[in-house]
Amino acid sequence: METKVAVLGAGAWGTAIAKVIAEQKSERGSKEVIIWSFETEVRDDINKNKLNSRYLPGVKLPDTIEATSDIEEAAEGKQYIIYAVPSLFLMDTLKKTLSVKSIREGQSIISVITKGFLPAENGPKLILETMEDFLPGLYRQSLVYISGPSHAEEVSAGKITGLIAASESAKNSIRFRDLLKSPRLMVYSSLDVRGVQVSAAAKNVIAIAFGILDAMKTMGKADMFGDGTESLLLAAGLNEIQILGNALGATHPETFTSISGIGDLDVTCRSVHGRNRRFGREIIEKNILKSYKNIDDILANIGEIGYLPEGVAAAKYVKVLAEKHKLKMPVSVGLCKLLNREIEPMEFCKNLLADWDM
């Protein structure tokens, strides 16, 4: 029996996930995987060449993967649907699929690999709770959130890593675990949907701070920063993620010491593939903030950067949440001040040393 899967989003991560699924062989039969891309050149590259040269260059895709620019065609009748677009575009993408019959009737199992928070009338909200407000009631407490210490470049190359499939529905969590797992991709199930979502979003904020500190160190901007300083930042960052997670309803403390917590934070901060780390480094190396007035100006012109650092929007929302819940989060709040041009990078780094209170 053929398993039908739609991946809505043809960026690097969506493409890598589609490749992993399409390559799996199982006793239950083959997998038909379709990727939705609003960019016709990406769609045509996937269909004609089995490549996504724009977002995941050099990676050959299985022949069983097809692409379409018709989102309803992509989603209709699929057993599994994975939303894989950046947080800035998630709700627009979701709304385009609400008329799909298999979604209206609750027949498709839905998961999300998007990282971040979403704006709402009463302040930023987690991704799944925002989606539940728009999807049919059948999907309440059944959506699956997928995260973990992984980069598209490595997952598509078959490097060993792990993911967590989190859902309030244990059955759906296990279904996505079984869909994604392979000999080189370990997938675990979790019921701590809120803790996993907070970890996935907030770690990008810490990664920008890490990139700033790393560039300061390697470029000789300040001899006070070393490897130990970076480890101190990781510890402080994990502490802030857990503080925020607890405030937003995380249910399992071990979430933050698992691959979805410290594991994802570490690889996001240290990997050369990390876009948020890269953005932090370029704040020092290229002085890119000089082109923008504040964080909203960065977000309004995010296309100019050439890649998407999700931590910029997340920093804005984390600051709002920290103030709302009266949380002490000096790294995240300080980064937001830096992106708003209220302080300079050196002041930001020095303030971190002064404000850390573990």
Feature annotation, model-predicted:
Residues 134-142, 160-254:
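Internal alpha-helical scaffold of NAD(P)-dependent oxidoreductase catalytic cores
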Residues 14, 88-91, 117, 171, ...:
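Glycine-rich nucleotide phosphate-binding loop and flanking beta-alpha elements
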Residues 1-57, 64-69, 73, 120:
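NAD(P)+-binding Rossmann beta1-loop-alpha1 motif at the extreme N-terminus of oxidoreductases
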Residues 19, 23, 95, 99, ...:
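Short, well-ordered alpha-helices that flank and scaffold nucleotide-derived cofactor binding pockets
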Residues 203, 208-214, 231, 235-238, ...:
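NAD(P)-dependent Rossmann-like dehydrogenase/reductase catalytic/cofactor-binding core
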Residues 61, 68-160, 176-178:
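Rossmann-like NAD(P)(H) cofactor-binding subdomain of soluble oxidoreductases
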